[in-house]
């Protein structure tokens, strides 16, 4: 019931995994709850942007080797800022509708697509996100490995 305890337990778990499997690539994501269709019980305001920033910065300090992903559930302003501080990955041009991408690529009708799983807060396209990252002084990296 306290997000700080959950964050600490997660960090310790990642630390333990890293000690046991030092060559494993580890990454964290902290998707905050967003309003859910037909669900009034979950309060997405329990963890604000300030608290999320606190958790992500603590992860960066305690787990400097770990990747940190920030989803499109967060606002564009928050994602632009956190990318400069500690995030290593941000999503762009996403869809949360069940079957939504399939509909786009296979010309299915809208009525074949399910409800969105959660609301997106940052709906920037890939191109817009790339442009915003560059304008913010960051170098977007799309691929940081080579297949041999």
Regions found by a protein language model. Name each.
Residues 8, 18-148:
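Auxiliary Fe-S-binding modules of radical SAM enzymes
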């Amino acid at each position: 019931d306290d997000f700080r305890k959950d964050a600490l337990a997660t960090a310790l778990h990642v630390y333990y995994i890293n000690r046991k499997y030092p060559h494993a690539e580890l990454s964290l994501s902290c998707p905050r709850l967003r309003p859910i269709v037909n669900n009034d019980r979950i309060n997405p305001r329990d963890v604000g942007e300030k608290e999320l920033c606190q958790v992500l910065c603590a992860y960066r300090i305690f787990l400097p080797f770990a990747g940190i992903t920030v989803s499109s559930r967060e606002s564009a302003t928050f994602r632009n800022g956190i990318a400069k501080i500690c995030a290593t990955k941000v999503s762009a041009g996403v869809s949360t509708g069940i079957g939504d991408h399939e509909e786009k690529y296979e010309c299915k009708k809208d009525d074949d697509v399910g409800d969105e799983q959660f609301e997106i807060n940052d709906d920037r396209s890939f191109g817009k996100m790339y442009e915003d990252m560059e304008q913010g002084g960051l170098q977007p990296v799309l691929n940081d490995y080579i297949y041999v």
